[in-house]
Curated annotation (Swiss-Prot):
Binds 1 Mg(2+) ion per monomer. Its EC number is 2.7.7.65. The active site is at E484. SUPFAM superfamilies: Nucleotide cyclase (SSF55073). Catalyzes the synthesis of cyclic-di-GMP (c-di-GMP) via the condensation of 2 GTP molecules. Cyclic-di-GMP is a second messenger which controls cell surface-associated traits in bacteria. Involved in the regulation of cellulose production. This is Probable diguanylate cyclase DgcQ. The chain crosses the membrane at residues 25-45, 365-385. GO terms for molecular function: diguanylate cyclase activity; GTP binding; metal ion binding.
C-alpha cells in the first residue's frame, strides 16, 4: 500500500496542472485554436453584415411596394371621393329637389309610364343622363325592391340631377368605366346608355342581383360605408373582370338605392405598369379581400397566379396580424400592403434571380466572395503554419529526447537520471518513505568488446538495457551512467524489496543466451550493488549511489554475477 501511495503522490506532484495543460495544449493545438477563433469571428462579422444587408433589402422592397401602393391608392381615393360627393348631392336632392319645369315634367312622365314593362325618361342628352325603369309589377317581384315611399317623386328628380353630375364626373382619363345609380324603386341611371328600351329590364335586374347592390342592404352594411366588390367572369361569358366601388344612398333612415363605379381590371393592370419604375425588377399583383387574383404587372401573368393554395394560406395567415409585411417563400421574397381606399391587398414578388441582378445581389456576391477568399487564405495559412509548428515540435521533441536519453540503450543518460532522482528522493523524504538505488555493472564486458568487436558490445548493452527495463516496476527509473554501468532508482522500495528487484535483474541477464554472430552465442552476467535510505536515513541520491557502487565492487570481488545489499560481502 505504501508503494502505491508513493506512486500516486509522485505523479500528482510532478504533473502539475500547468504541465498537464502544456502537454494537452501543444503548439499544434494552440495554432488550431487561434485559427478557429479567427475563422469564427470573421464568419460572425460576415453574418452580421448579411443581417444588415437583409434588413436593408427588406426595407427597399417595402419602399418600392409602398410607392406603387400610394400611387394606386391616390387614384382609387379620387374615385371614392367622387362617389361620396355624388351621394351627398343625391341626399340634398332628395330633401330639397330643384323646382324646374323639366323636372316636374319628368315626374309626370314617370307617372304615365310606370305601369309599362320598360320605360325611359330623357330630358337633354347633352346635359343629363336618361332614367331607365321597369313596371310596378316587376318591382313587386323583388325582395329588396319597393316603390312604396313618399319621396318617390323626389327620387326621380334626384336621379336626373345626379345623372348630370355623373356625366360631368365621368371622363376618358378616369379609371372608371361606368358610373351608375340603381334605385330600389325600379329604375337606374348609368353613364353607359341603354340604346333600346327592351333591354332595360335585363340590365336593371343585372344590377340589382349583383353583390355590390345586395351587399348594401341595412342588414349587410350596417355602417353604411363604402364597399368594394369583385366580379369574376363566368367560364362561358365574355364579360371582363372588374371591381366595383359602391355606397348606399339613405335619407331619413330609408334606403333608396346604390351609387357605384365599375373599374375594369385591365385598367388597373395598365395603371400598375405605368406606376412601376422601369429600372426595378419584381412583379406586382393585386388581390381582393378574399385573396382572389385580380391583375398583375407582369405580362406573363395577366390572368394567372404564381401562388399555389398552400402559399396563399401562408400569405393569408401573415396578413391577419398586420396591414403590411413580408414573407419568404422558397427563393422568392413576397412583400404585401393593404390599400387604404380599396378592400384588397397589393403584393410584390421578388425572385432570387432578380435579386442577384440587382444592387443588393451584387453586394451579396461581393461579400460572399470576400468571405470565401479570406477563409481560403486563412485555411492555407493555417495549413502552412500548422506544418511548420508540427515539424518544429517534432524536431524539438527529438532533440529533447536525445538530450535526456542514451541513444544506444534508450534509457536515461547520466544527467537526466540525476535530474529525475533528486525530486524523487526529496518526495520520499517528505513522506518518510524508503528510497533505494541499484548499481548494475556487466561482467567481463571489455573481453566481449575485445573478442567480438564494438558492434557486438553495443548489442550486448542494448540487450541488457531491455532486460533491466522489463524487470522494473512502473514507478522505477533506470539509466546508463557510463560504459557498461547502469543505475536504477526505486522510490518507495525498501532495501529488501530493492534486493529482490536486483536479483530479478541478475537472473534475467544470466539466463538468456544472446546471438552476437553467425553460430555464436554468449551468456552475460552482471554484478549489482543495492543501497537504501532505510539504512542511515540519508536521502542524498549521490551518497546512496556511491554506497551502491561500493557494494557492486564487493559483489565483483566475491566472484561476480551476484547481488550485494550490505557491506558484508
Amino acid at each position: 500500500m505504501g508503494v502505491v501511495r508513493v506512486q500516486h503522490e509522485t505523479k500528482m506532484e510532478n504533473q502539475s496542472w500547468l504541465k498537464k495543460l502544456a502537454r494537452r495544449l501543444g503548439p499544434g493545438h494552440v495554432v488550431n485554436l487561434c485559427f478557429i477563433v479567427v475563422l469564427l469571428f470573421s464568419t460572425l462579422l460576415t453574418w452580421r453584415e448579411v443581417v444588415v444587408l437583409e434588413d436593408a433589402y427588406i426595407s427597399s422592397q417595402r419602399n418600392h411596394l409602398e410607392n406603387v401602393a400610394n400611387a394606386l391608392d391616390k387614384h382609387l381615393q379620387y374615385n371614392v371621393d367622387k362617389l361620396i360627393f355624388l351621394r351627398n348631392g343625391m341626399r340634398e336632392a332628395l330633401v330639397a329637389p330643384l323646382d324646374f319645369t323639366s323636372l316636374r315634367n319628368a315626374v309626370t312622365e314617370f307617372e304615365q309610364h310606370r305601369d309599362e314593362h320598360a320605360w325611359q325618361i330623357e330630358l337633354n342628352r347633352r346635359r343629363t343622363l336618361s332614367v331607365n325603369g321597369v313596371s310596378d309589377a316587376l318591382v313587386s317581384e323583388g325582395n329588396l325592391l319597393s316603390r312604396e315611399n313618399e319621396s318617390l317623386d323626389n327620387e326621380i328628380t334626384a336621379a336626373l340631377e345626379v345623372g348630370y353630375l355623373l356625366r360631368l364626373a365621368h371622363n376618358t382619363s378616369s379609371m372608371v368605366e361606368q358610373a351608375m345609380y340603381v334605385s330600389r324603386a325600379g329604375f337606374y341611371v348609368s353613364t353607359q346608355p341603354t340604346l333600346f328600351t327592351r333591354n332595360v329590364p335585363t340590365r336593371y335586374y343585372g344590377y340589382v342581383t349583383q353583390p355590390w347592390f345586395i351587399g348594401h342592404s341595412q342588414r349587410e352594411n350596417r355602417h353604411r360605408a363604402v364597399r368594394w366588390f369583385t366580379s369574376q367572369p363566368e367560364h362561358a361569358s365574355n364579360t371582363e373582370p372588374q371591381v366595383t366601388v359602391s355606397v348606399p344612398v339613405d335619407s331619413n333612415n330609408y334606403w333608396y338605392g346604390v351609387l357605384g363605379m365599375s373599374i375594369p381590371v385591365r385598367t388597373m393592370q395598365q395603371f400598375l405598369r405605368n406606376a412601376i419604375d422601369k429600372n426595378l425588377d419584381g412583379e406586382y399583383q393585386l388581390y381582393d379581400s378574399k385573396l382572389r387574383f385580380l391583375t398583375s404587372s407582369n405580362p406573363d401573368h395577366p390572368t394567372g397566379n404564381i401562388f399555389d393554395p398552400r402559399e396563399l394560406a401562408l400569405l393569408a395567415q401573415a396578413m391577419e396580424h398586420d396591414t403590411r409585411g413580408g414573407i419568404r417563400m422558397d427563393s422568392r421574397y413576397v412583400s404585401w400592403e393593404r390599400l387604404d381606399h380599396f378592400d384588397g391587398v397589393l403584393v410584390r414578388v421578388h425572385t432570387l434571380s432578380e435579386g442577384v441582378r440587382g444592387d443588393f445581389g451584387s453586394i451579396s456576391i461581393a461579400l460572399t466572395l470576400l468571405w470565401a477568399l479570406f477563409t481560403t487564405m486563412l485555411l492555407i495559412s493555417w495549413y502552412v503554419i500548422r506544418r511548420m509548428v508540427s515539424n518544429m515540435y517534432v524536431l524539438q521533441s527529438s532533440l529533447q529526447w536525445q538530450a535526456w536519453h542514451d541513444t544506444l540503450t534508450r534509457l536515461y543518460n547520466r544527467g537526466a537520471l540525476f535530474e529525475k532522482a533528486r525530486p524523487l528522493a526529496k518526495l520520499c523524504q517528505t513522506h518518510q518513505h524508503p528510497f533505494s538505488v541499484i548499481q548494475v555493472d556487466l561482467d567481463h564486458f571489455k573481453a566481449i568488446n575485445d573478442r567480438f568487436g564494438h558492434q557486438a558490445g553495443d548489442r550486448v548493452l542494448s540487450h541488457a538495457a531491455g532486460l533491466i527495463s522489463s524487470s522494473l516496476r512502473a514507478q522505477d527509473v533506470a539509466g546508463r551512467v557510463g560504459g557498461e554501468e547502469f543505475c536504477v532508482i526505486l522510490p518507495g522500495a525498501s532495501l529488501t524489496e530493492a534486493a529482490e528487484v536486483a536479483e530479478r535483474i541478475r537472473l534475467k541477464l544470466n539466463e538468456k543466451e544472446m546471438l552476437i554472430a553467425k553460430s555464436t552465442t554468449i551468456r552475460i552476467s552482471a554484478s549489482l550493488g543495492v543501497s537504501s535510505s532505510e539504512e542511515t536515513g540519508d536521502y542524498d541520491f549521490e551518497q546512496l549511489q556511491s554506497l551502491a557502487d561500493r557494494r557492486l565492487y564487493l559483489a565483483k570481488q566475491a566472484g561476480r554475477n551476484r547481488v550485494c545489499a550490505s557491506d558484508n560481502a
